[in-house]
A protein has these predicted regions:
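Transmembrane alpha-helix interface/packing and boundary motifs in multi-pass membrane proteins
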Residues: 85-93, 252-273
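Re-entrant/interfacial helical elements at transmembrane boundaries that shape
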Residues: 96-106, 266-283
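Hydrophobic alpha-helical membrane segments of integral membrane proteins
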Residues: 100-104, 116-119, 131, 220, ...
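Membrane-interface alpha-helices at helix entry/exit sites of multi-pass transporters
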Residues: 74-79, 93, 97-98, 108-124, ...
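Predominantly cytoplasmic-facing regulatory/coupling regions of multi-pass membrane proteins
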Residues: 1-82, 140-141, 145-260, 288, ...
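Membrane-embedded alpha-helical segments of transport systems
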Residues: 83, 87-91, 115-139, 294-309
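Short intracellular "coupling" helices and adjacent cytoplasmic loop segments at the cytosolic face
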Residues: 82-99, 205
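Transmembrane helix-loop junction
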Residues: 66, 89, 107, 238-239, ...
């Protein structure tokens, strides 16, 4: 029952945001005209780069697995990643993409706990890298290198507060001394319910405590993924006629990435469009709402198309009886 209610909530949020944006923010005809004039050559190049970002993400996952003594062929991880993306984008009300990745890996290795840990650490390191990039780029606003009104300057403090909280959380998960201190805080009545979740997260990340270089390398790969997706957004903006400076993409793209994580939706639909309009049109004032939402819709299509191979791979796997490929150690 709870799952059905969550599904209905996601559908309602996605449809509600789309209805709001196309009723009060943009004209549907204008958006369709902008999309209809897209340069398909640049769109194809952006799609190729996006596949590259996905491949980089799988490389980071393999790096983390090796630190746990798990050897999985990169080709197999690509498959699990694409299958996860497919289920996450098209069947999100039923199952999340990270759950699919972890399930596939667990079948491959017969090490369910380690598989779950690798997926969790992969996600945490990626979020930390994106938060760090967002915080670093907001300095350009604070220093006046990127012009912004009071709303954008206020957002700088929000980003830095969120980044600071993220760093403290990550440190509290890794450090045994901080862990002991935090566990004292969880004795308070208001925080006691969150104590089991914190302990599970901390125990999951402890195997990497003695491997800081691996975490640093994973952090670097996450930044590389962000750089590639920045280039993807710039190419799509150019495909729609240009006018969006790269520095604004570097500023806002890592922030946009958090929107579908914080707000439940169906594959990010509606939430992504609202985030693009908020950052690029409202806070940045660098493009119109029509252009921002057109860009977000084109990016949404790109995300959906790039995950389609996962459906094909899953179907082929089912025809073979769902047997995982490749050796594992």
């Amino acid at each position: 029952m709870r799952g059905k209610l969550l599904t209905l909530l996601k559908v309602a949020i996605s449809l509600g945001l789309i209805a709001y944006l196309f009723t009060f923010k943009v004209d549907l005809g204008t958006v369709l005209r902008v999309l209809g004039q897209a340069d398909l050559g640049r769109v194809a190049l952006a799609l190729g780069l996006y596949f590259g970002a996905i491949a980089l993400g799988a490389t980071k996952w393999q790096l983390l697995l090796r630190q746990q003594g798990i050897q999985v062929p990169l080709v197999a991880l690509w498959r699990y990643t694409f299958e996860g993306l497919f289920f996450g984008n098209f069947l999100l009300p039923l199952v999340a993409s990270d759950v699919v990745r972890g399930y596939d890996l667990a079948r491959h290795t017969d090490r369910a706990a380690e598989a779950a840990i690798s997926v969790l650490v992969d996600k945490l390191v990626g979020l930390l890298a994106f938060a760090a990039a967002a915080a670093a780029m907001t300095l350009t606003v604070a220093l006046g290198w990127i012009p912004g009104g009071p709303a954008l300057r206020g957002a700088v403090w929000v980003v830095w507060a969120a980044f600071g909280g993220f760093v403290v959380l990550f440190a509290a998960l890794l450090s045994r001394r901080l862990r002991a201190l935090v566990e004292r805080l969880f004795r308070l009545p208001l925080l006691s319910r969150a104590a089991p979740l914190y302990r599970r997260l901390s125990e999951a990340i402890q195997p990497f405590r003695e491997r800081p270089l691996a975490l640093l390398q994973a952090f670097g790969i996450s930044l590389a993924v962000l750089l590639v997706t920045n280039a993807v957004n710039w190419l799509l903006a150019e495909a729609l006629g240009g006018g969006l400076p790269m520095r604004y993409i570097f500023l806002f793209n890592p922030m946009v990435a958090f929107a579908p994580i914080l707000i439940p939706s169906v594959g990010g639909l509606g939430v992504n469009q609202g985030a693009y309009d908020l950052f690029y049109a409202s806070l940045g004032g660098v493009v119109s709402s029509d252009f921002a939402i057109s860009l977000s819709l084109l990016m949404q299509v790109l995300i959906y198309v790039s995950s389609l191979p996962g459906g094909v791979l899953w179907w082929r796997g089912q025809r073979r009886g769902g047997k995982p490929e490749g050796p594992a150690a």
